[in-house]
Amino acid sequence: MVPALRYLVGACGRARGLFAGGSPGACGFASGRPRPLCGGSRSASTSSFDIVIVGGGIVGLASARALILRHPSLSIGVLEKEKDLAVHQTGHNSGVIHSGIYYKPESLKAKLCVQGAALLYEYCQQKGISYKQCGKLIVAVEQEEIPRLQALYEKGLQNGVPGLRLIQQEDIKKKEPYCRGLMAIDCPHTGIVDYRQVALSFAQDFQEAGGSVLTNFEVKGIEMAKESPSRSIDGMQYPIVIKNTKGEEIRCQYVVTCAGLYSDRISELSGCTPDPRIVPFRGDYLLLKPEKCYLVKGNIYPVPDSRFPFLGVHFTPRMDGSIWLGPNAVLAFKREGYRPFDFSATDVMDIIINSGLIKLASQNFSYGVTEMYKACFLGATVKYLQKFIPEITISDILRGPAGVRAQALDRDGNLVEDFVFDAGVGDIGNRILHVRNAPSPAATSSIAISGMIADEVQQRFEL
């Protein structure tokens, strides 16, 4: 007999569904700041869904919301391995609403970021979620950076980023009085928000529409059912079995995985390809002391170096008024390793046997050494920051939080730059859709991504 599962869902009613017993309803929260999800439970005999989303981060929750709003007659559930939602990449990022300037023209990142930023601002206004459209300067501090800055500006225009302009020293000072620079791109549509608050609002919308959220459900297997469950009246209507580490299982017709740092492993569990592999990069942030936060008004970014895969250390205001400096980018020895000495033997073994990572490390050895040096010595990071704001000293800096970025890597050692969506082959492959690579700007793009996923699900699964 399948053990009963605990759901973080409303117990106020029943939603429509395509299986016996329906789905727990929502508690009718008013719009505005997301409230805690209300508790409820369901018996094992009704642990079946038409669609299951694996992963309770911002992309998974946005996708669940989009699907249930488009298909209100379907029963849809979200599985999350933690006791709370949106606690990893969604809850450990800089909170920047990106404009879409950095990405290759015509790529999914470029299209979905520009579209997603506009949708996100609109959503926050509708829901009363606080945000600040504080803008961003991408600043050239050396003469040799100016051609790269101008090329980036042209890329932004190709991507349709609104409001971009090139500005000179005097205009840089008007926007950021303490920032030095020769030339900058002014990105007025860049902003900041608390993405966990946005994700919890998505979850609230999902539940109000009749969706169900299961926490503490760590998936360890996804397979096709071999027979009907004991005492089931559904027979083989729900042919996919999803099992967790506690021996519990649910059944469903279709699966969408949005597993972030574990997207490759979840794909492999379902019998699909593990490639591209996920490599975890930890990013450490520093904090400006409160009495020095006046030095920064909006986002200040360096000109990215196309030889290296990350954007570089930058200045980021937060919704609480603090200023974050960073992040760096160093290889993490645990997929959820937020501290320098966090270690997982399984994750390290993945790193050792990953031929693509060995190639990446050899191609970017000097960059990696520099990032490790900055992570260990505050003075090195401060020296870099002083290129932009000379007034900053090491006594103005505190160590801050960290995040871990899930970055897909191919077998040739190339970082997969665009969003990747994949499916498998055979019976289960026809019933599953994997979100395989969704690093930054996935949070900014989450509403746009969810619309694309809903389109793909509708077409692929013939809903």
From Swiss-Prot:
Cell inner membrane recorded as keyword: no
Tissue expression summary: Widely expressed. Highly expressed in brain, testis and muscle. Expressed to a lower extent in lymphocytes, fibroblasts, keratinocytes, placenta, bladder, small intestine, liver and bone marrow.
Enzyme Commission number(s) of this protein: 1.1.99.2
NCBIfam families on file: PRK11728.1
Name by which UniProt lists this protein: L-2-hydroxyglutarate dehydrogenase, mitochondrial
Any Gene Ontology CC annotation: mitochondrion
Presence of keyword ATP-binding: no
Lineage, top ranks: Eukaryota, Metazoa, Chordata, Craniata, Vertebrata
Effect of K81E: In L2HGA; alters protein processing and abolishes catalytic activity
